[in-house]
C-alpha cells in the first residue's frame, strides 16, 4: 500500500522543468546513461533521461488502447500547464516493463535523475538516480518504492537509528574501555554511515517528541517499560547539530515502590560461561589446531589496556583462538587474535582475562544488542514523524526490556564523554568539503519509589574542516558513502591527530593512514531550505524563497537546478553563514525532576498513582 499522496510536494520543480528538454542529448549503452554538459544558459537546461529507443504506453481514463510515445515526445508535446493536467491519465507504462510507472515517477525522474560523463550505473528504466557530487544513489521505482519521496521515508529512519545506536554504542564502549582508550573508539563507526546520517538530519524536523510504553511480567511483578525520546535540531555558525535525549524508565506497576528492581532481574551470562563458549565469543571461526601460525605472539602480565607492545584499540581483537603449543605455553592461558595478526596470551584465571572478555568479546555481543535496541527506537521515532507506522515495509520490533535492564545495572550514576571526532569527505559539484562529525554522549541514572530512570544524552554535530591538500585530484566514482572519499583502499572508520583508520573492502583489517595537516578557512554556503522544497507550500513559496535572503546569493541554487541544490544540501551540513549563530553554547540537557516523576505515572488509569491523588 503506497503512502498517502501529499499535495504537490516534490513535483513542483519537475513541472517547471518539463519545457527544458531540448538542450541535452542522451544515449543508452550497456545500462549506462551519459549527458552532454549543460549549455551556457543553465536556466533552460535539463538532461534527457530516456532516449528514443524506450517507449511508454499512455493510458487515459476512457480509452483502453494506449498511445506509444517516448519520454521526450511526451514532454515536448505538453506545455507546463498541460503537464499539470496529466494527473488524469492512468499511468506512464514502459512497454516492456511490467510494474506501472506513474506520472509521479516520471516527475521524480525529471527532477532528480542527474548523470555525468562517468555514467550513472543505474538501470535506466527502473531506477532514478541522485547525485551527491561524485556519489550516485539509485532509487528503485517499484510498486512500493516511488522515487525520491521514498528515499526520504527510507533513509530518514535509517539515519536517525544510526545516530541513536552509534551514540549509545560509543558511550557503552567508552565506559568499558572496549579498545583501551577513554577517548577514541572504533566500534560504533562500523554502524555509522555518514551519508545516511547527514541526509536524515536534513529530513528531520526541528523538534520531535515520542513516548512508547510496553508492559511485561517478570516473576510475579507487573512491569512497564517507558521510553521517552526528545529530539532537537540546532543550526549554528559551525554547522548543524541534533541533540537527542532518550529516557528509559522501568516501572513496577503493582506496588508502591516496593522491590521495583524485580522488574530488572533477567537472566545474565557469566564471564566464565563466555570464556568456555566459543559461540559466545562472537561466533568467530577459529583456526584449526594443527595450523602453524607465522605471527608474533605477545605475552603480558599487565592489564590489556596497558600492554607495552601495542595499543589494542589500534588493533581490534576479533577472535578467540583455541589453546595449543604453537600459541601459548599451556592450557592455563587463553589466546586472543587481533585484526592485524597479533596473538595475545593471558592466564585463564587472571582478572585481566575476564576484563578483556567482558570489554571486548562479550562487549561485541552486548553492543550489538544495544544498537538493535537503539535502532528500534530510532526507527520508531522516524516512523512516527513520517506517519509510516502500520504500512507495509515498515519493520518495528519490540524493545527488549532485558537490554534496558542491563543498561540500568551497567551504566554509572553519571558519565559524560569528551567529543569524539570523525572526519568525512563531502564532495560537491562546486568544490570538495572536509567535514568533521563530533559526537558527545552522557548518561544520568536516578531511582524513584516505584521505578528506575536511565537517561542517555547524545549530541551529534557536523562542522566544516578543510585540508591544504586536494583530496579529489584523483577522482574515484561509486563510493558507498561519503567516508570512503578519504580512503582509497576502503571506508574510513575513524580519524584523529593526523591518523586515519580505514577498513578495506575485501577484509576486516584496520589500516592506518597519515593525513596532511588541516586548516579551516571561511566559506560562504548558499542554501535553499530542503524542508520547504518538499513541503505542501507549492511553487509560489519556492519562487519567493529564490528571492529571499536565505537564497539570494549570486551562486544560489535555482529551482530548475536541483543537482546543484542537492550538492548544497551537504555543503550546508558542514557550514552555516554567521547570521545563524547559536545564542548559547551546546549544553547537556535533562528534564526536571518533576518531569521525571511524571514519566512514571502508570498508563493503566485503574492503578493508583504513586504520587498521591494522581493530579499533576
From Swiss-Prot:
It is found in: Virion; Host endoplasmic reticulum lumen. The keyword Signal applies. GO terms for cellular component: host cell endoplasmic reticulum lumen; viral envelope. This is Glycoprotein Q1. Plays a role in virus entry by participating in host receptor binding at the cell surface. Glycans are attached at residues 23, 44, 282, 330, 351. It comes from Human herpesvirus 6B (strain Z29) (HHV-6 variant B). Residues 1-24 form the signal peptide. Keywords: Glycoprotein, Host endoplasmic reticulum, Host-virus interaction, Late protein, Signal, Viral attachment to host cell, Viral attachment to host entry receptor, Viral envelope protein, Virion, Virus entry into host cell. It comes from the Viruses. Transmembrane segments: none annotated. Glycosylated by host. One of its GO terms (biological process) is entry receptor-mediated virion attachment to host cell. Interacts with isoform gQ2. The heterodimer gQ1-gQ2 associates with the glycoprotein complex gH-gL to form a tetrameric complex. The gH/gL/gQ1/gQ2 complex binds to host TNFRSF4.
